[in-house]
A protein has these predicted regions:
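Generic solvent-exposed, charged/amphipathic alpha-helical segments
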Residues: 83, 248-249
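Glycine- and acidic-residue-enriched helix-capping/strand-helix junction motifs
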Residues: 238-245
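Single conserved hydrophobic/aromatic residue that forms the stacking wall/gate
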Residues: 250-260
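N-terminal export/assembly segments and adjacent metallocofactor-ligating motifs
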Residues: 1-216, 223, 233-235
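Short amphipathic C-terminal alpha-helix that caps PH/PH-like domains
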Residues: 210, 247-248
Length: 260
């Protein structure tokens, strides 16, 4: 009696392949789908059990704010209200903001609505002011691929705790350590990651020294065949996020390496 829907997990940035089993409007369980390039046959506990909170914390009705309080309204009334507001608001005063859990199809539809219909380019999806340079596609992709972690011989973690933020990715790092004894470094002590790693001094000067070939790690990165640098959300949200992001992006220009 369960309806089975194949989809992608949104609990982290890994994009694990999953199957969601539903009965009527209720999500009953979430199971992994095999994808050797991403999650293999695994999913994290967060992915598996997040549906438990949907019964009491699921928004499936539009809300409108009146006198400081949110009230439920019908979809038809919501669209009417949106149309009224848009008709009396100049394009340069209309802003679109999509949430972290918004799917790509919806985001693309919102982009078309703003650019082609409303003549507005004020769109964003970064509620936390995360710095990302979109000029180069490699700036926002995981360039080695999740599966490519297993081929890496050096990994540098900057501002991330992969065990907490992306469990499946962390399991890949552990796998490559056990298989290849890969050297792993972190800009800060983030606790037990289930594999050993060396902690560097936690400040942006260390990154600067590495880029300028003035740090012991510079030679290791340069001599590694497939080094990987992984940037986390916390570092991109920090005041030094823009500098660190751009500095790391140009590492392959200052160090002779095949960096991912």
């Amino acid at each position: 009696e369960l309806k089975k829907t194949e989809t992608i997990d949104v609990m982290d940035a890994v994009g694990s392949n999953i199957r969601v089993d539903t009965y009527d409007w209720e999500v009953k369980r979430v199971l992994p789908r095999i994808n050797e390039e991403i999650n293999e046959e695994w999913i994290s506990d967060k992915t598996r059990y997040a549906c438990d909170g949907l019964k009491n914390q699921r928004l499936d009705t539009p809300l409108i704010k009146n006198n400081g309080n949110f009230e439920e309204i019908s979809w038809q009334d919501a669209y009417k209200k949106i149309k009224e507001k848009i008709s009396i608001t100049p394009p340069d005063k209309i802003v679109g903001l999509t949430g972290d859990m918004t799917n790509m199809e919806t985001m693309f539809a919102v982009k078309n609505l703003f650019q082609k219909t409303l003549n507005s380019s004020y769109l964003d999806s970064r509620a936390k002011h995360t710095y990302i340079n979109f000029e180069n596609r490699s700036n926002y992709l995981f360039n080695s691929g999740i599966e490519g972690i297993e081929e890496s011989d050096l990994i540098l973690l900057i501002g991330t705790n992969p065990r907490f933020e992306a469990t499946i990715l962390n399991s890949r790092i552990r796998k490559t350590y056990l298989k290849n004894k890969t050297e792993i470094f972190s800009l800060e002590d983030v606790g037990d990651l289930t594999y050993p790693y060396k902690v560097l001094e936690n400040n942006s000067k260390v990154i600067d020294k590495i880029i300028k070939n003035e740090h012991n790690l510079s030679n290791k990165i340069a001599s590694a065949e497939k080094p990987i640098i992984i940037l986390g959300q916390s570092i991109l949200n920090s005041k030094n996020g823009a500098y660190i992001f751009e500095a790391v992006s140009y590492t392959h220009l200052t160090l002779p390496t095949n960096l991912s």
